[in-house]
Every structure is written in C-alpha cells, then in structure tokens.
C-alpha cells in the first residue's frame, strides 16, 4: 500500500512542498520504515506475517549492509537501543522481531503517534539522568532477553555434544578391549607354534619315534584298503561266464572284453545275401563263408599316384576260416569312411598283439577296437587268444568242439529259421554297382546313379537302419538274460 503523503502540493506548482518541521515524523522512524518496506531487503529484514511487526533475519548482514546505508553506522546494539527509546518491544524470543502499535505496514501516517521518551524542560537535568538510566535499562532488558536465549541454545548444543562424546568414548573402550583380546589370542597362537616347532625338532632327533610313526601310518593304510576296495558281488551266472572267459587268457592281465559276431549273426547275414538278386551279392552267396573287408584306396590317393598313402573305402573280399588273424590285421589299416553307396554296418574287431600290429594310438577314431591294459604294457584280446589257440584245430572236429565249449557263455542271437528275421527278408534289395565301377567312375556318374534311383536307395537305407536297431535290441536283451 502506498503511504499517505505528508505534504499537500501547492496549486501553483507540480512539485510537493517541504513538510513543516512541527509534528513531523522522526528521521529514525522514517528511515526504519523505508528500510523494512523496501522489497529488495526482504532477505535481511522484512515485515512479519501479521504486518504489525518487522523481523531482522540476519543480524550480521543487517549490520554490515543496511545500517551503514541508512544510519551511517554499523552497530546493531545502537539500533536496538534506538528502537527501545521509541517504545518498540521484542515479540519472539527466538528471533529479532520488534513491534510497536504505530509501526504498521501500509500505514506510514501512524508514525507520528510514536513519541520518543524524553524529560520535561523543568526537570531537565534530573530527567536527563533518569532518561539515560531508563533507556539503558530498556536496552538491557531487550538485549538481556536475547542473550539468555542464546545462552540456553548454546547449553543445549553443549549437552548434545557431551552425549556424543560419551558415546564415542564408550566405542573407543570397546574397541580397545577387542584389540586386547585379539592380541592375547595371537600370543597364544605364537606359543602353540613354538611348542609345535620344538616338538618336531625333538621328534626328528628321535629315530624311534619316526619308526613308530611310519609303522602307525602303514597300519592305518592297511585298515583303510579293505574298506575302500569293497565291491558288489556279481550274480552266479555272470561270475561263471567271466571266469570262463578270463581263464583262457594270460594271467594277471586286465582286459576289456567285447564279444564279436557269433554264428547266428553270420548265418543271418548269409541268408540276407542269398535273398538278394543283386549281381554284387551273387559272388558272395556262392561262397557264404567268404565275407569281410579289403582295403580300397581313396579317390584322392588314386589321383596322386600313391594308393597306399590313404585308405578311405571298404570292399567285400573272400577269406577262409583259417585266415581270421590275417583279416583282422588289416582292419586297423583301413579307415572305414562311410560311402554314400555302401549301406553296411561293420562290427568292432580287435587285434592280437602277436601279429605285430600298429599301436592303439595310431588307429582311426572311427574304430571302437578292443583295448587292453596289462602290467607289462602288452595288449591282449581274449577272443583273438581263443582264435590263436584253436587255429590249428579249426578244421578238425576236436577244434570245433573246443570252440563251441569256449563260446557257450556268449549270448546268441535267434536262429536262422526264427520268424523274427522273416520281416527283414520280405523285400529284395536293389542292385549295387561293383567296387571296380565305383573306383573307376567319376563323381558325375555317382550323382547320376543317385538321381536315377533315389527312392530305392532311401528304402535300402531305411531297411538297413531298422535291421541295425533290431540287432542292437536283441544283443541288449541277450545280455540282460
């Protein structure tokens, strides 16, 4: 609100006239009002929420900036004394808030009602002394009230700091106690370590103690061995079969036994070959006993002129029953790569160490040959050992009887006339080109053959896969029995 003008402008001029000195507002009150009413000074001093008092928010800033600007000094205590002489009182004890009935916001004309306390002219000397004493008392009253509050606040802060100090001292004592406990434990550990070192030194100097300790360790080891080597006892049938197979081998040799194809599987394969009308199998069906493998050089080796450098194919070759070992010696040298036109399944075949074959590390990973572990580092195959012993008697009736006795424990597949095999021989297999044609033919001819007969090859592969799965099921069932 705008203040009421204290002077009335004259009708002859536009400028206001100078107010008369009689009944004028004291300069202190006028300057104080302008200072409080200025919006630029609200951060330091401003009106209160009720607009009936003013608050000094920052006394240091008020003394440093505003007092020199309006009153030519920077003494805040002198300003408080001046307020006291004009009847101002402190409203809030926690802050510098002063009020007067004639000091209101927007009503500057009421400043005329504020009168300074001063003595009369008759008793001027006495009243002056009284005024001085009263003014000093009033100033002390206002200042004393603020200082007491400040002292109380400082006392409260001191109490808080003392409590924090006590808490920190308690934590320090607890930490010192923990450090002492840790130091004691460290000393105990050092003493134990010294005792152990002295004990070990004495033990090393005493040979009887060392002998006793070694003997005790040996006794403890002997006690632990029987318990650690306990195994589950096998059934009677499995023990008899295993005893018969291992008794024919060398003594104190650890072998991994894997049965080869038996007579029933050979007869089944003969019948399978006899049922085929392919010219490829006619030469084999004429001699049912002639079956197995021969080495065929790969196309890469043939092109390079070094047919013995690499073997990647498999062919059918004839051999007599007396040449089992010579046939098996050729197996590790051949890498049985899968040819797209050869739908044969080759069983795993071992090798006898007496034939001087290559070591197991040089064999192709496509073979799952029978491995062995012996004390002397030699390889031993129980099946090949049986064949070695019965090679001289293979033709005589006594040799055949001995072979039958040795193979009694081996599980056998169903017989030739079993109706189970009839489902595999109801469909004739398609003709397959000879090995010579495969080697001499180019890749284009092979692709042409595959394009001409895709359905027959697919049906042939499905039949062979199904036959292989059924043979695996039969072998697993025979082992369970």
Curated annotation (Swiss-Prot):
Q: Which GO terms describe its molecular function?
A: DNA binding; DNA-binding transcription factor activity; sequence-specific DNA binding
Residues of the region (Hydrophobic repeat HR-A/B) are 138-204
According to the UniProt entry, where does the motif AHA sit in this chain? 418-427
Q: Which SUPFAM superfamilies match?
A: Winged helix' DNA-binding domain
Q: Report the subcellular localization.
A: Cytoplasm; Nucleus
The entry's comment on post-translational modification says: Exhibits temperature-dependent phosphorylation.
Give the Gene3D superfamilies listed for this entry. Answer: Winged helix-like DNA-binding domain superfamily/Winged helix DNA-binding domain
Segments of this protein annotated with the region Disordered: 1-23, 213-244
User: Could you state one GO cellular component term attached to this entry?
Assistant: cytoplasm
- Any one Gene Ontology biological process term? response to heat
Pfam families in alphabetical order: HSF_DNA-bind
- Top-level taxon of the source organism: Eukaryota
Q: Where is the composition biased (Basic and acidic residues)?
A: 234-243
| Coiled-coil stretches | none
Motif residue range(s): Nuclear localization signal: 229-233
Keywords in UniProt for this one?
Activator, Cytoplasm, DNA-binding, Nucleus, Phosphoprotein, Stress response, Transcription, Transcription regulation
Could you tell me which residues form the DNA-binding region?
A: 25-119
Question: Where are stretches of biased composition, namely Low complexity?
Answer: 1-16
Q: Where is the composition biased (Polar residues)?
A: 213-227
Induction behaviour: DNA-binding capacity is reduced by HSBP in vitro.
The sequence motif named Nuclear export signal is recorded at 467-474
- So what family is this one in? Belongs to the HSF family. Class A subfamily.
Supply the domain comment: The hydrophobic-rich region (HR-A/B) corresponds to the oligomerization domain. AHA motif is a transcriptional activator element.
| Function in brief | Transcriptional activator that specifically binds DNA sequence 5'-AGAAnnTTCT-3' known as heat shock promoter elements (HSE).
User: This protein is called what?
Assistant: Heat stress transcription factor A-1b
């Amino acid at each position: 609100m705008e203040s009421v003008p204290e002077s009335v402008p004259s009708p002859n001029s536009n400028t206001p006239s100078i107010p008369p000195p009689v009944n004028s507002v004291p300069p202190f009150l006028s300057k104080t009002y302008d200072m409080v009413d200025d919006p630029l000074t609200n951060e330091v001093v401003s009106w209160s929420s009720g607009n009936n008092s003013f608050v000094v928010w920052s006394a240091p800033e008020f003394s440093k900036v505003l007092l020199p600007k309006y009153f030519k000094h920077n003494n805040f205590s002198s300003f408080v004394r001046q307020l006291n002489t004009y009847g101002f009182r402190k409203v809030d004890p926690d802050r510098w808030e002063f009020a007067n009935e004639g000091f209101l916001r927007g009503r500057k004309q009421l400043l005329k009602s504020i009168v300074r306390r001063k003595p009369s002219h008759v008793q001027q000397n006495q009243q002056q002394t009284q005024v001085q004493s009263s003014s000093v008392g009033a100033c002390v009253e206002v200042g004393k009230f603020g200082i007491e509050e400040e002292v109380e606040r400082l006392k409260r802060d001191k109490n808080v700091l003392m409590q924090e100090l006590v808490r920190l001292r308690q934590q320090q004592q607890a930490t010192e106690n923990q450090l002492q406990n840790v130091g004691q434990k460290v000393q105990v550990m050092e003493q134990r370590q010294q005792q152990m070192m002295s004990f070990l030194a004495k033990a090393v100097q005493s040979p009887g103690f060392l002998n006793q300790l070694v003997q005790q360790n040996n006794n403890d080891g002997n006690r632990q061995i029987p318990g650690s080597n306990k195994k589950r006892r096998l059934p009677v049938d499995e023990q008899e079969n295993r005893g018969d197979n291992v008794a024919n081998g060398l003594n104190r040799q650890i072998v991994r036994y894997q049965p080869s194809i038996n007579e029933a599987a050979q007869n089944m394969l003969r019948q399978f070959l006899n049922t085929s009308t392919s010219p490829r199998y006619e030469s084999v069906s004429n001699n049912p006993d002639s079956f197995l493998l021969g080495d065929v050089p790969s196309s890469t080796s043939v092109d390079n002129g070094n047919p013995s450098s690499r073997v990647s194919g498999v062919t059918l070759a004839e051999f007599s029953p007396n040449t089992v070992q010579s046939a098996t010696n050729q197996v590790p040298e051949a890498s049985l790569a899968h040819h797209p036109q050869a739908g044969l399944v080759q069983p795993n075949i071992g090798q006898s160490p007496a034939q001087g074959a290559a070591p197991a590390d040089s064999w192709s990973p496509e073979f799952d040959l029978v491995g062995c572990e012996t004390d002397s580092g030699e390889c031993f195959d129980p099946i090949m050992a049986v064949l070695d012993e019965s090679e001289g008697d293979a033709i005589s009736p006594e040799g055949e009887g001995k072979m039958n006795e040795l193979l009694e424990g081996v599980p056998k597949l169903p017989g030739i006339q079993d109706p189970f095999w009839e489902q595999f021989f109801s469909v004739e297999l398609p003709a397959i080109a000879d090995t010579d044609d495969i080697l001499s033919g180019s890749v284009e001819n092979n692709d042409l053959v595959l394009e001409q007969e895709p359905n027959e090859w697919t049906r042939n592969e499905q039949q062979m896969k199904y036959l292989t799965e059924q043979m695996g099921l039969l072998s697993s069932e025979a082992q369970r029995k």
